[in-house]
Amino acid sequence: MPAYRSRTTTHGRNMAGARGLWRATGMKDSDFGKPIIAVVNSFTQFVPGHVHLKDLGQMVAREIEAAGGVAKEFNTIAVDDGIAMGHDGMLYSLPSRDLIADSVEYMVNAHCADAMVCISNCDKITPGMLMAAMRINIPVVFVSGGPMEAGKVILKGKEHALDLVDAMVAAADESFTDEEVTAIERSACPTCGSCSGMFTANSMNCLTEALGLSLPGNGSTLATHADRQRLFLEAGRLVVDLCKRYYEQDDESVLPRSIATFEAFENAMSLDIAMGGSTNTVLHLLAAAHEAGVNFTMSDIDHLSRKVPCLSKVAPAKSDVHMEDVHRAGGIYAILGELDRAGLLHTHLPTVHSRTLGDALNQWDVKRTNSPTVQEFFRAAPGGVPTQVAFSQDRRWKELDLDRETGVIRSAEHAFSKDGGLAVLFGNIAREGCIVKTAGVDDSILKFTGPAKVYESQDAAVTAILTGQVTSGDVVVIRYEGPKGGPGMQEMLYPTSYLKSKGLGAACALLTDGRFSGGTSGLSIGHVSPEAAEGGEIGLVENGDVIEIDIPNRTIHLAVADDVLAQRRAEQEAKGWKPVKERPRKVSTALRAYAAMTTSAARGAVRDLSQLKID
């Protein structure tokens, strides 16, 4: 049986100094022999998705200690992508994922912790912790802070559900008065929690359920609801049990790499496609699989996207549907249940909480269980009161949404579309692929051909959109914004939001080697690989070039002759694959270090040290 890792620092005469330091943290003689479990928190007052986490780490710690473990809490950083959006702060968002993964590894390995509870929530925090969990491979349970309640605002006598993206769009839409924009701003983000649509944060927290690393309800139970407290308490108890099973019973099935296998990543990606999750999840699942030693690639995602239907549309794809509505329809296990009934799920896999995913579905899928407890759990409703306090209300819907024909979650027979909510496109402008969130694309533009309008920064594209230089039928190309070229692979929420505010959301396409916020909708194609800074063909596009997009056939094509592209490539090679004009962008040493080691979006923008020239 494997020895508890913590005994490296708690046992033996030569560890007297280490034990002395442990004693200074509050440990007693009786604690030296218990598993030491890291409570990996991410509390910060900068981020609404994390502002309520301050005391929750200690809540989990108390449960760990009551169950026979020793809990030690630390925090990671957390970047709010919405606040960092639209300026150079966004350069730091994706790099923060790797910094979080490293910091968790550093703390857990330096102090020889035996297991972890990862308290995450927002965009890069869950992926960063997930990468660390795969890398370290000790027992872990994920529990997130939970989704924000959707905002409510009355405009022109009618109530509207809304979220952060609505505030961005309204601010740039001249048809809204200043008073209406202010009302939307004040109502868009009413509570603590991750932004209320199927954006990146909520998508990732849902995917931890499909991977088998979090408890049912983790992705959809509101941050404000009292039911969410149960998830935190149970996580504390569960991680001690997992610890004992591994270290005392030699049960390797509880380890993250035993749970998050290739088939588990297929399950997670199938869920993502079915629920129209954020395109960023592709980037993060590829990175997590890399850390787990799982060969999960863009080709695998392409294969799944061709057979998994779109079973749910949530904001931004459907502006009046939010995570609270998904929860009412049975949450993530309801979507997994529909995938299972369609023969699209691997149900024999273990989870942290059940022997198999199939067992968990029998208990938690609202269409196959009669459990009053489960049904009450999924009737958890928003409180409708602005607050930054977790678990502060216990309202219930009168009934569940079990309509699988026209409801929030559909059966495969009544899917929103037979094609899933995400697609991978390949072509001469994206040899290694690119990603589009098809759930947010109007059916009328699934096939689109138009002239390119080329911009070499997000800022330049935003200026062009707001000043009327982009017109109906254009393909907006934003390049040199990839992992290396940005550096940091900025999100493009403002360009897509401004296209919508100008009435061009279903009249233009946007193509970039950067990425998109989970709040993005429209014909927005990101992660173009290879990126311009690495010699990708997106760097060869010129104004007026015709670009042909065919989502049903999964192709994207730059209609320029091969000999012309070869000539352009020679010219770019001579220039060193850089933007034509110097950008007013300060790139720090930290960001330059990130750029030196990162890889393309097609690989999850993971680090590859072989790129460094080390003597």
UniProtKB/Swiss-Prot annotation:
InterPro entries the record matches: Dihydro-acid_dehy_C, DihydroxyA_deHydtase, DiOHA_6PGluconate_deHydtase_CS, ILV_EDD_C, ILV_EDD_N, IlvD/EDD_N
UniProt pathway: Amino-acid biosynthesis; L-isoleucine biosynthesis; L-isoleucine from 2-oxobutanoate: step 3/4; Amino-acid biosynthesis; L-valine biosynthesis; L-valine from pyruvate: step 3/4
Biological-process GO terms, alphabetical: isoleucine biosynthetic process; L-valine biosynthetic process
Active-site residues (renumbered): 517 (proton acceptor)
Cofactor note: Binds 1 [2Fe-2S] cluster per subunit. This cluster acts as a Lewis acid cofactor.
KW Iron-sulfur (keyword) present: yes
Keywords for the protein's UniProt record, in alphabetical order: 2Fe-2S, Amino-acid biosynthesis, Branched-chain amino acid biosynthesis, Iron, Iron-sulfur, Lyase, Magnesium, Metal-binding
Protein name: Dihydroxy-acid dehydratase
Organism: Novosphingobium aromaticivorans (strain ATCC 700278 / DSM 12444 / CCUG 56034 / CIP 105152 / NBRC 16084 / F199)
Gene: ilvD
